[in-house]
Structures are given as C-alpha cells and as structure tokens.
C-alpha cells in the first residue's frame, strides 16, 4: 500500500459508519498498514471540531495521536498552497474551501495519494499534480 492522506470527508463518513470505497480503504489502512496512513494538521482540526460529544472528541484525539503526521515547513507550505489557489483561480476553477488547497499541497509536496469525498479535490487534481484515489 502506498502512503495516503485521508481527507476529513472520509473520516467523517467513516465515523458515521457510511460504507463507500473511500471508507473501506480507510478501514483497510487502519487494519493492515497504519505506517502508510498519514494525517495533516488541517484534517485533525476539521474532524475534531465537528465532533459532538466530549467522549467522541477524546476517543478520536487519543487515536489520532498514534498516527503519522507530516512534519511541515509551515511558511513554505502556506505560500505554495496560496499559489495553488491563485493558479486555480486564474484557470477559473473555484475552490470552496481554501483549506482544501493546503491539504492538497501537502499531498503534492509529499507525492502522496489523497483519498477524499469532496469535489474540491477533483477540481484541484484536474488542474495540478495532485493524485487522488478514484
């Protein structure tokens, strides 16, 4: 299995018990190949912010603390993700959430597969070097 980032959208579906090719792949990574599963700070933040109970928050917080996270040069990734957003805007590609450009840029910089359930990433992949799971 190759190294992969699972976007917040997949973690949300997974936590709700939704069965899809993305959540099935996440479960496979969790069961068979945790070393290849990476998180980004944005995914952790977005997911934890959306939880409804303290118990769920603490459960996922403890779980996320055991997973890999990319070490980042925040200045460089911030500038390059802004450039990605800017370049997409010039191509008249509208990205609803600028944080998706940050997640995408981290995946691009690390040549990592991005697994998602968010149309923003499809638009980014069609207009950049982003590799997405289909």
Q: What are the roles of these predicted feature ranges?
A:
Residues 8, 41, 97-101:
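Conserved glycosyltransferase catalytic-site signature
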Residues 1-3, 104, 108-134:
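Acidic, PIN/NYN-like endoribonuclease modules and their adjacent C-terminal/linker elements
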Residues 11, 44-47, 121:
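A generic structural signal for short hydrophobic patches within well-formed alpha-helices
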Residues 6, 39, 72, 115-116:
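Short beta-strand scaffold positions
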Residues 55, 61-70, 74:
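Active-site-proximal, substrate-binding regions of enzyme catalytic domains
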Residues 1-39, 49-62:
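Short, well-structured N-terminal submotif of metal-dependent ribonuclease cores
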């Amino acid at each position: 299995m190759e190294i992969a980032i699972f976007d917040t959208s997949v973690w949300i579906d997974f936590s709700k018990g939704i069965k899809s090719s993305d959540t099935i792949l996440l479960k496979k990574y969790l069961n068979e190949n945790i070393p290849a599963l990476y998180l980004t700070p944005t995914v952790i933040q977005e997911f934890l912010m959306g939880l409804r109970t303290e118990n769920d928050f603490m459960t996922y917080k403890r779980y996320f603390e055991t997973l890999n996270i990319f070490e980042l040069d925040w200045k460089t990734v911030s500038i390059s993700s802004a450039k990605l957003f800017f370049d997409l805007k010039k191509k008249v590609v509208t990205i609803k959430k600028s944080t998706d450009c940050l997640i995408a840029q981290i995946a691009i910089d690390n040549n990592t597969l991005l697994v998602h359930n968010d149309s923003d990433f499809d638009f980014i992949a069609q207009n950049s070097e982003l590799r997405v799971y289909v």
